[in-house]
Amino acid sequence: MINPSEIIPGVLFYSYYSSLRKEKVAFLEHNMLVLQVSGRFTMETASEKFSMERGEMLLIRRNQLGELTKTPLNDEGYQTIVICLKEDLLRQIALEEQIETEKKYTGPNNIIIPGNDFLDAFFKSVIPYVRHSEQNVTNSVGMLKVKEAVLLLLHTLPDLKDFLFDFSEPYKIDLEKFMLSNYHFNIPIEKFARLTGRSLAGFKRDFQKIFNMAPRAWLQEIRLTEARHLIEKKHKKPSAIYLDLGFESLSHFSHSFKKKFGKTPSQWLV
């Protein structure tokens, strides 16, 4: 089976891995409900780190950056089932069920969902779609599964209404604090802008005022400065740090490092 498999287009996904897998940059655009079938799922953001194992469920808030680590345990491998709770589907559910909320959600971004018979039965009902992924499943079936998941979540934790049905744009947050915490994520400038609650033009304008540099130039500068610190003071190997600092390849990192400091990272290490 291809990993991850799209069981119901845009809605239901299944992942299986037999060896550890780390994804440095995960831009979590939509709300997601994750069931851990086996193995350990670990997510680390700028502000928190948490894990879950077999049988646990996690509701993940949209518009986050994180590092994901997927670890097989024992002989079971790593397996997850993910329900993608896209905004258009949630808006449709809100209309059909006459769900209204005027409060902007301000709670935690990631919530462990306590298990119960209803949610356990729901996820068992999803298993056949995974086992028979070669059969085409219509979008209407996908919508029904999303709606069932949402209603069961609200039955379990009614206060999740604000989490699920807050469709407002992100607040305009402290840009300097956010960038200093997240510069190492290799994502487009447009996504940095969105995550700070700004248009691209507004992001560039505010960025210039705060850092007195354009975003791309600043990102290159701070990543290379941190790389030199790690190599010089921590004796880190270039191959061990370039991905964690947001560089796409070792060759790109080495070229940029030499251009700025006059030596390659390996020469600097010596």
Annotated model-derived regions:
Residues 115-128, 143-146, 162-188, 193-196, ...:
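A short, Lys/Arg-enriched amphipathic alpha-helix from helix-turn-helix/homeodomain DNA-binding modules
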Residues 8-103:
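N-terminal regulatory/effector-sensing and dimerization cores
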